[in-house]
């Protein structure tokens, strides 16, 4: 697969040959969905907590005598049916993380990249550098390229000026190649890869 390379100014800078083993697969929604669910499960805090009947600070004395009241039998005021009682089967602090094999994660990333390439939502930049860290100038460059909702992936090191200028632009994320992931690829309309990012991806999956 061959794609043209553009600069931030919108000029053509040649073309790049993309590996079909990474960008030319037929996307499978089931594999992508498994990886997205794995990511969302892993990042969930799991700090929810409700007190059970054993954790309620209340007297343990029997409420009233067993017989002769005409009412139902009760032994504790901490039970869930009373106001202020403990929660029955309430949430507890736990990890929501699930397991997903590394090979499936790698395959899901390839399918997400292939999906963007197939839909025509993959853009290749020569580099992601900016002389002056000016957000207004960067917005102008992105408008010229038609990028209003995009994820930009650079090489191992982000250019400080570019990253600082992009920080305040809504619907735009900038990540180094180490941070590339299926969820962020799918949540943005366009995927922008620099030539350094493509080289790193091909080296990773070689």
From Swiss-Prot:
One of the primary rRNA binding proteins, this protein initially binds near the 5'-end of the 23S rRNA. It is important during the early stages of 50S assembly. It makes multiple contacts with different domains of the 23S rRNA in the assembled 50S subunit and ribosome. Part of the 50S ribosomal subunit. GO terms for biological process: translation. HAMAP family: Ribosomal_uL4_B (MF_01328_B). Transmembrane segments: none annotated. This is Large ribosomal subunit protein uL4. NCBIfam families: rplD_bact (TIGR03953). GO terms for cellular component: ribonucleoprotein complex; ribosome. The keyword Nucleus does not apply. InterPro entries: Ribosomal_uL4, Ribosomal_uL4-like, Ribosomal_uL4_dom_sf. One of its GO terms (molecular function) is rRNA binding. Pfam families: Ribosomal_L4. Keywords: Ribonucleoprotein, Ribosomal protein, RNA-binding, rRNA-binding. The keyword RNA-binding applies. The gene is rplD. Belongs to the universal ribosomal protein uL4 family.
């Amino acid at each position: 697969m061959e794609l043209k390379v553009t600069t931030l100014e919108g000029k053509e800078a040649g073309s790049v040959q993309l590996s079909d083993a990474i960008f030319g697969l037929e996307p499978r929604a089931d594999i992508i969905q498994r990886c997205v669910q794995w990511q969302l499960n892993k990042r969930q805090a799991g700090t929810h907590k409700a007190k059970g009947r054993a954790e309620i600070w209340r007297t343990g004395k029997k409420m009233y005598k067993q017989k002769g009241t005409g009412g139902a039998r009760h032994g504790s005021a901490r039970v869930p049916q009373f106001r202020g009682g403990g929660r029955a089967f309430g949430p507890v602090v736990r990890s929501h993380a699930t397991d997903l094999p590394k090979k499936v994660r790698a395959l899901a990333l390839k399918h997400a990249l292939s999906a963007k390439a197939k839909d025509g939502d993959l853009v290749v930049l020569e580099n992601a550098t900016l002389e002056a860290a000016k957000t207004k100038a960067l917005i102008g460059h992105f408008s010229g390229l038609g990028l209003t909702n995009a994820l930009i992936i650079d090489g191992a090191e982000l250019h400080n000026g570019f990253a600082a200028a992009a920080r305040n632009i809504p619907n735009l994320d900038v990540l180094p190649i180490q941070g590339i992931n299926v969820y962020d690829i799918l949540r943005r309309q366009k995927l922008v890869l620099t030539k350094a990012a493509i080289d790193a991806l091909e080296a990773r999956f070689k």
